[in-house]
Amino acid sequence: MDARGGGGRPGESPGATPAPGPPPPPPPAPPQQQPPPPPPPAPPPGPGPAPPQHPPRAEALPPEAADEGGPRGRLRSRDSSCGRPGTPGAASTAKGSPNGECGRGEPQCSPAGPEGPARGPKVSFSCRGAASGPAPGPGPAEEAGSEEAGPAGEPRGSQASFMQRQFGALLQPGVNKFSLRMFGSQKAVEREQERVKSAGAWIIHPYSDFRFYWDFTMLLFMVGNLIIIPVGITFFKDETTAPWIVFNVVSDTFFLMDLVLNFRTGIVIEDNTEIILDPEKIKKKYLRTWFVVDFVSSIPVDYIFLIVEKGIDSEVYKTARALRIVRFTKILSLLRLLRLSRLIRYIHQWEEIFHMTYDLASAVMRICNLISMMLLLCHWDGCLQFLVPMLQDFPRNCWVSINGMVNHSWSELYSFALFKAMSHMLCIGYGRQAPESMTDIWLTMLSMIVGATCYAMFIGHATALIQSLDSSRRQYQEKYKQVEQYMSFHKLPADFRQKIHDYYEHRYQGKMFDEDSILGELNGPLREEIVNFNCRKLVASMPLFANADPNFVTAMLTKLKFEVFQPGDYIIREGTIGKKMYFIQHGVVSVLTKGNKEMKLSDGSYFGEICLLTRGRRTASVRADTYCRLYSLSVDNFNEVLEEYPMMRRAFETVAIDRLDRIGKKNSILLHKVQHDLNSGVFNNQENAIIQEIVKYDREMVQQAELGQRVGLFPPPPPPPQVTSAIATLQQAAAMSFCPQVARPLVGPLALGSPRLVRRPPPGPAPAAASPGPPPPASPPGAPASPRAPRTSPYGGLPAAPLAGPALPARRLSRASRPLSASQPSLPHGAPGPAASTRPASSSTPRLGPTPAARAAAPSPDRRDSASPGAAGGLDPQDSARSRLSSNL
């Protein structure tokens, strides 16, 4: 008997599939894993020896193994041997054959069998006979069905459809600007979406898109009912027409649907701090609050009235016309105006999307809400003015009968009634005539009370709105009232009062802000951006700041304080201790000295910076010529920032020494600090290069100021005396001791014009000043003063050379950003000495100014003694310079 039609192979165990216990040892590789030769047609397998029951010894192949090389054999090997026991595809293939066979006519494996209890009931199978007839092989549909079932055995169609997923997303809050602002982050929005999913079926989030569109639709129906229903009740007798019935049916249906949806919509508690999504809590909360009002306003009174109307004859209907008052239950829909708050929240969402300001949005919404409420009350009052006489069958002393308007059209009646109501509410009259009946008198008083209340609310809201739109001006006015009371209390003269008034006008310009509080509430990056935008250009005009670290400049900007000075005010006075430096944002100041010499400084200039380091006394006075808006920087804040940037402190000190040297003064404190840093080896190559560039650009700035304005605070200095080579060598040695990297002499037109500096004569022929002949012609004003001038591209037309470090952007050193410093009017202005125009061509870069040792060794107008014999007699120049510097300190 063929094994395919029999009940099973002799000796084969019914449970051929391993149980989910410890897996048996892997059997030897089956022959189908080796590439078999093309087999001949397989003969029908006859009964053979039974395969062993022990899994490790299951090496004998069944008769159908001869077909493994064919197409169905390859397909079966891909499907894990057609569900043979012990293969992964057994479960899926066992149910893939419609005739009870495993894909190609083999007996299917069914549960139960002797080996089942030993290996587990879920995976033990027994072979049962197949139905008669040929069995088709496994087709693509069977394989697709097997794969669709999945490893977890999920049935087809278990996932939600696309439409269901889309509708479910409408019930959840979307990821948009409004949701992100309400919940804080996208992660919080996703958590809220998970809350909606876990809350139950058909739970609507109050911030979902579905609820938004539904509320907007209900708002339209609500406005329509609040306007149309009073008109229909009052001015129309026949309410059984088709349009009226359709409107009532549609509106009542939507109100009932809204009543049901409110039981499934989350409730926002305590200013959006908590959202209730539990169905039980939603139901209890809604029943305790707005359910009664919504239910009463949603009762289909129209249907009940139409049903009752058909059973009443005409006579009874005339007497029952007063039942129309029942339609006033729709007026309870007025309480639905409280849902306008939800509309306002979504209007805010639209405003944020279109980048509208909050003040404009709140102003528009408050005005629109107030005007809409007043118009709605006027509409209701007009309907009430005609409804009461109508219910009384138009007595002779009512305003309708007096004017003979009983049979007029409803539009004329409504117009006169609305005019009468608005006259009462605005308290401007009684309409066409004064009330005569007692009913009209009471209606008039009621209208006046409602109108006065609305008028007061409108005035209050409008006043608060105007104040909120310009709170800074209101704050300024309140502050100035206090100032006026102060001046009156102290009986100040009229000129003082006018001066104080002008100061407040220019200082605050009609608006007062608490700038410190506003900036203090912002985060650090935003505050720095605002400060940089307001005044960084002013500070960047300084060479020290232009070549400084941007972080240092930002730290300095946060310490600035805004001040305003009037014409004639002395900002600083000569002889006082300097505690501030100033940056001019707008205005003109004059720098005055004892010699009555003036120098004008305007927008972008600065003065008083040397005193930040020395805390010395002012050498000049600064007076405001116009209204000046300045930024001040105190010495304490300046030093606080310099503690974090020691290199910038050394740069400030070096520039201060150079400036003092140019005006013929010195400061022992700064000299001691620089000498200490020099001896301790604090200066490195990069810092020294940065400081050299700062000093160079500071000198070039003074040079450009001298070219543009020859008038200074002092007369032109005398020409520098002739010097010997020994003194020049000492000067170079002193410069090398201050900065070891500098091995070339200091040259420059400014240094030649200084009475304290000496110059080594250029090699070659003697300068023209020493010859008895006429002096050489001066350079034209537009020509560069020296070969170094063409390289100073920030002031010329050539490109600037790259600076020594990454913190030295040459583009910041433009001529426009180099205003004159107020500490430099003390510099000797005037035409440079004769040697300035005959300066030799040299490629050396100007370095720091001469050290105090060089100044001590060099002859000057202040010191007429000769050079030190030690310096001229061949002593070490560096030792001589350092010894003299120590003696000066």
From Swiss-Prot:
Residue list for modification Phosphoserine: S146, S161, S668, S754, S771, S779, S786, S866, S868
Q: How is its activity regulated?
A: Activated by cAMP, and at 10-100 times higher concentrations, also by cGMP. cAMP binding causes a conformation change that leads to the assembly of an active tetramer and channel opening. Binding of cAMP removes a tonic inhibition conferred by cyclic nucleotide-binding domain (CNBD) on channel opening. Channel activity is modulated by intracellular chloride ions and pH; acidic pH shifts the activation to more negative voltages. Inhibited by extracellular cesium ions.
Question: Impact of mutating L418V?
Answer: Found in a patient with childhood apraxia of speech; uncertain significance
GO MF entry, a single one? identical protein binding
Q: Which domain of life is it from?
A: Eukaryota
Q: Which residues bind 3',5'-cyclic AMP?
A: M599, G608, E609, I610, C611, R618, T619, R659
Q: What are the residue boundaries of the intramembrane regions?
A: 414-435
What InterPro entries is this protein classified in? cNMP-bd_CS, cNMP-bd_dom, cNMP-bd_dom_sf, Ion_trans_dom, Ion_trans_N, K/Na_HCN_channel, K_chnl_volt-dep_EAG/ELK/ERG, RmlC-like_jellyroll
- Identify the glycosylated residues: N407
Show the ranges annotated as biased composition (Gly residues).
1-10
Stated family: Belongs to the potassium channel HCN family.
Q: Which PANTHER family match?
A: I[[H]] CHANNEL, ISOFORM E, POTASSIUM_SODIUM HYPERPOLARIZATION-ACTIVATED CYCLIC NUCLEOTIDE-GATED CHANNEL 2
UniProt-recorded name of the protein: Potassium/sodium hyperpolarization-activated cyclic nucleotide-gated channel 2
Q: What gene does this protein come from?
A: HCN2
